[in-house]
Design a protein with these regions (language model features):
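Short basic helix-loop element that most often maps to the first helix and adjoining turn
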Residues: 14-31
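A detector for short, charged/polar N-terminal pre-domain segments
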Residues: 1-11
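Residues within helix-turn-helix
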Residues: 28, 39, 68
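Residues that mark the N-terminal boundary/hinge immediately upstream of a DNA-recognition element
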Residues: 15, 26, 52-55, 66
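DNA major-groove recognition helix of helix-turn-helix/homeodomain DNA-binding modules
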Residues: 35, 54-69
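Recognition helix of helix-turn-helix/homeodomain-like DNA-binding domains
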Residues: 35-50
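Conserved amphipathic alpha-helical interaction elements at protein-protein interfaces in regulatory
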Residues: 18, 22, 50, 62-65
Length: 72
């Protein structure tokens, strides 16, 4: 079961990184836009942390995505 959660965290992180790059934002810029720390956002992108719903909402707003897109 933990392998499944790990794979989901990694896939979500990779998707967030891809969307950030498509928006031409640096990690620091996205961190500032979402009031997240740069290291925490980096850990999310690397699949080391599962973000809360509040964090996903902040990321979706900053990246102009629907929250449902990040949760799918």
């Amino acid at each position: 079961m933990s392998d499944l959660w790990e794979a989901q965290r990694e896939a979500l992180g990779a998707f967030i990184r891809e969307q950030r790059k498509r928006a031409n934002l640096s990690l620091r810029q996205l961190a500032e836009m979402t009031s997240l720390s740069n290291p925490y956002l980096s850990q999310i992108e690397r699949g080391l942390h599962q973000p809360s719903v509040r964090v996903l909402k902040a990321l979706s707003d900053a990246l102009n995505l629907s929250a449902e897109t990040l949760l799918a």
